[in-house]
Swiss-Prot record:
SUPFAM superfamilies: dUTPase-like. Homotrimer. PANTHER family: DCTP DEAMINASE (PTHR42680:SF3). DCTP binds at residues 111-116, 135-137, 156, 172, 182. It catalyses: dCTP + H2O + H(+) = dUTP + NH4(+). It comes from the Bacteria. Keywords: Hydrolase, Nucleotide metabolism, Nucleotide-binding. Catalyzes the deamination of dCTP to dUTP. This is dCTP deaminase. GO terms for biological process: dUMP biosynthetic process; dUTP biosynthetic process; nucleobase-containing small molecule interconversion.
Length: 190
């Protein structure tokens, strides 16, 4: 698999709707102020998180169980920024909707601006023929509250394309993946 450049990302997004909405360059300012950048970079695409957040709370003192997840463990917030409590996490979703080609795998890495503040972004790889808004998990590893900004860059997507003779036999769509076509912040499913 080879990593794909800005030219490929632009072409696939503009001609095939791989990323919508799509920003062909890097956006570093909004309303005359510097922001955490988003858009196309040399070998990736920096995504934004939407204004939709789910902040984890221990109000119910439950056990976190991915097979029997209690949605009451979250507080829903719609805002331009989100405060994550110390040693806790929040879920959000990308502004961008993705349609991944059958010969492509996408890996997500956190942006260094957040990582240097102790905020870690975790996302499972976007598999071939998956589509939807990406649910993002932000871990605040610090003993202090941490702030996330909506509509600014939060993570970078790296695109890897398989050789023509090595395309997967079964894609995410073929398997009927449980997160196919997700919109909004999506909680764990089994």
């Amino acid at each position: 698999m080879s990593i794909k450049s800005d030219r490929w990302i632009r072409r696939m997004s503009e001609q095939h709707g791989m990323i919508e909405p799509f920003e062909a360059g890097q956006v570093k300012q909004a309303n005359g102020e510097r922001i955490v950048s988003y858009g196309t970079s040399s070998y990736g695409y920096d995504v934004r998180c939407s204004r939709e957040f789910k902040v984890f709370t221990n109000i119910n003192s439950t056990i976190v169980d991915p097979k029997h997840f209690d949605s009451g463990s979250f507080v829903d917030i719609t805002a331009d920024e989100c405060i994550i409590p110390p040693n806790s996490f929040a879920l959000a979703r990308t502004v961008e909707y993705f349609r991944i080609p059958r010969d492509t795998l996408v890996v997500c890495l956190g942006k260094s601006t957040y990582a240097r503040c102790g905020i870690i972004v975790n996302v499972t790889p976007l598999e071939p023929e998956w589509e939807g808004h990406v649910t993002l998990e932000f871990s605040n590893t610090t003993p202090l509250p941490a702030r996330i900004y909506a509509n600014e860059g939060v993570a970078q997507m790296l695109f890897f394309q398989a050789a023509a003779d090595d395309i997967c036999e079964t894609s995410y769509r073929d398997r009927g993946g449980k997160y196919q076509g997700q919109t909004g912040v999506t909680l764990p499913r089994t």
